[in-house]
């Protein structure tokens, strides 16, 4: 094989590697209820930072009641919108929260409507429907118009965020 053939072969292999389907490391799949069925939706993966605004509320982690809510932020996907249609979808998603238990990484981690999802995040975190509704209200009452998260000091949080696939 000549040097020019080796270069051509290498370029072909490089092109094939780039053309192969790859998962987007910036997207995470979350299972949410849309009121009719549970669907797998995509959300931008993020690790929200806390702002220090305190309000009450309890969340479970690793099967035990361990923490109180300690902060809220207004961070979310770059696609979060202050438009009324998105905010209306979030209100509809909130109204779909049932009196059940939601779990991060579980078959049902929250609810969705349109492009808005409300869900539990963190390692082995679970929350009741009442905690989900209270967190939603706290995020809104803290001035977050579109997306945001309520955080607990055990690494669990409830998030309102832009999603696709609901």
Region spans (language model):
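N-terminal propeptides/leader regions of secreted preproproteins
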Residues: 19-69
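Mature secreted bioactive peptide module from preproproteins
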Residues: 64-166
